[in-house]
Design a protein with these regions (language model features):
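Catalytic cores and adjacent flexible loops of soluble metabolic enzymes
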Residues: 1-326
Length: 326
């Protein structure tokens, strides 16, 4: 479970640290930042504006300038995360970010959906030998394949993602997880912009082993990604649901399990008993037996002692036993 801080710190280190603390309290395993400078992504051109969505009308430069997490914050954020038992890492958008995070011994790197075509960046992150997580929103299958090739032998996780903020449930297309597993193997995961419990449970059932979602401080606030983020209590509830889903998967098994309640159903199993009163000296025939739910009787999957002679009379519905025969 990865809690994504993104730009929800509103440009304040104190809020970023509160988000780290909230991630730990909510039960996340890891917390993720984003490390870039606006110039890594765009240029300060007044006509380069966002069209539609929650940031409609802002220039790209304005958006990324507001959302950035300064590199100077990273040592304190990483230390705070580790102190709370979280795994800290970040999305990177340029090689310098990888170099900066290597100095903090970052255990993993994330490649955002819109950077999946940046093969040199992926190779730079993969060259560290650390785990590389890659979101696939908007990416064609060819782009995903190229990204995986760019990782080489470095361990990686593909995160199915819908590049909509938020992502409608009916457009989540979780069967993509099965496709990714078939083509590229495990593990896979979900970078979630919809945050619906039903979708998360379905993703886990389909093989997702990583779930990432945006975390924000309690409303009201001016969090940049508020439209597709969870408050701490909402995130905590989702983590609880995820843990239940994980527990319910169990293993593939058949037959009787270890639960006492399962063993209590033993008396309901079908067994073979005598179908009628039978006298001493009777030779047992198939029609003399019947399979019924009974607490005692001849095991239904064991061949009957047909043709054997009774050593004594037996009543109807008595359990068939070897000692009944000569």
């Amino acid at each position: 479970v990865v809690a994504e801080i993104s730009g929800n710190h509103e440009g304040e280190l104190a809020k970023a640290l509160k988000l780290v603390d909230a991630a730990a309290s909510a039960g996340a395993d890891a917390v993720k930042m984003q490390l870039y400078r606006p110039g890594d992504l765009t240029a300060d051109v007044p006509t380069w504006k966002v069209r539609g969505g929650p940031w409609d009308g802002a220039t790209l430069w304005q958006l990324y300038e507001r959302a950035q997490t300064p590199v100077e914050w990273m040592p304190e954020l990483f230390a705070a995360a580790r102190a709370r038992g979280l795994v800290p890492f970040a999305s990177v958008f340029a090689p310098w970010a990888v170099e900066a995070l290597e100095k903090l011994d970052a255990p993993a790197y994330k490649i955002a959906s819109l950077e999946l075509g940046e093969r040199a960046l992926i190779a730079c992150a993969a060259h560290t030998g650390k785990l590389v997580l890659m979101s696939t929103g908007r990416a064609t299958l060819g782009t995903v394949n190229d990204a995986v090739e760019s990782c080489g032998p470095t361990p990686h996780v593909l995160l199915h993602c819908v590049a909509s903020y938020p992502a409608p449930l009916e457009q989540t297309h979780l069967r993509t997880l099965t496709h990714l597993r078939t083509l590229f193997g495990d593990p896979v995961g979900l970078s979630d912009h919809g945050c619906k419990p039903s979708a998360v449970c379905a993703a886990i059932a389909l093989g997702a082993r990583v779930w990432e979602a945006h975390l924000m401080l309690p409303r009201p606030n001016r969090a940049l990604d508020a439209g597709h983020s969870l408050e701490p209590e909402e995130f905590k509830e989702m983590v609880a649901i995820i843990r239940e889903c994980e527990a319910s998967l169990g293993v593939s098994r058949f037959g009787l399990g270890d639960l006492p309640a399962e063993r209590d159903t033993d008396s309901f199993c079908r067994r073979v008993v005598y179908a009628a009163d039978l006298p001493d000296g009777h030779v047992l025939r198939p029609r003399d037996t019947v399979r019924l739910r009974a607490p005692e009787g001849w095991p239904a999957d064991v061949p009957l002692p047909l043709g054997r002679t009774l050593a004594h009379g037996v009543p109807a519905f008595a359990p068939i036993q070897l000692e009944d025969f000569r």
